[in-house]
Design a protein with these regions (language model features):
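Electropositive, glycine- and tryptophan-enriched low-complexity nucleic-acid-binding patches
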Residues: 146-195
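Long, contiguous hydrophobic alpha-helical segments, chiefly transmembrane helices and signal peptides
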Residues: 37-39, 85, 156-157, 176
Length: 195
């Protein structure tokens, strides 16, 4: 499995290097988009509970060495720099990261251990709200009205391939719950799941 992880990291770096950089060209640019992407991805791979604890862990010498060895990345942006760079990235630009990783796992036989019945897979679904406001909103917000007060939110449905025998899971492309063109009704997690 370590060889597969190494190949996955190479694939991830290639996918992340394709992210559009929305900054104006400058000689003062310190970080590449791929470094910001690897910095964000590393929080999950190293299983740190937050960006802050991840940054604190990397400040220690041995963790920094482990990070460089695993991710082949010398420059690590801070959590704020990662947010500033990646917040402007369109979610569709991240889909190849998931697709390419899943294709590689399948080609390397990594998905076989997750097979359930008749070559199928168990999929865990989790819907979550990651933004909510009674004032600030955009065209992608879901609107909930309660007692005459509108609450605007962003929600996402996350699907993951799981197995009862394996502690790791394989994330699939998240589906954002947002208004769909040509539909009068608001989007919901059930509809997002069908997409």
């Amino acid at each position: 499995m370590p060889k597969v992880l190494e190949k996955l990291m190479i694939e991830a770096k290639e996918s992340l290097s394709e992210l559009k950089d929305n900054r104006k060209p400058s000689r003062a640019t310190k970080y590449k988009m791929e470094e910001a992407g690897i910095g964000a991805l590393s929080v999950f791979i190293m299983q740190d509970p937050s960006f802050l604890s991840h940054q604190e862990r990397l400040a220690k010498g041995s963790s920094q060495h482990n990070f460089n060895g695993l991710f082949k990345c010398e420059n690590i942006p801070s959590a704020n720099q990662i947010r500033n760079l990646l917040d402007r990235t369109k979610t569709e630009e991240c889909a190849p990261l998931y697709h390419n990783g899943l294709s590689l796992l399948e080609a390397e036989g990594g998905l076989a251990q997750f097979e359930f019945i008749d070559g199928g897979y168990l999929i865990a679904l989790d819907g979550m709200e990651y933004y909510s406001s009674k004032a600030l909103h955009c065209e992608n917000c879901t609107i909930k009205n309660h007692k005459g007060v509108a609450t605007y939110s962003h929600s996402v449905l996350c699907a993951t391939i799981v197995s009862s025998d394996i502690k790791e899971a394989i994330p699939l492309v998240p589906e954002f719950v947002s208004p769909q063109d040509g539909h009068d009704k608001q989007d919901c997690e059930n509809t997002a799941c069908k997409r």
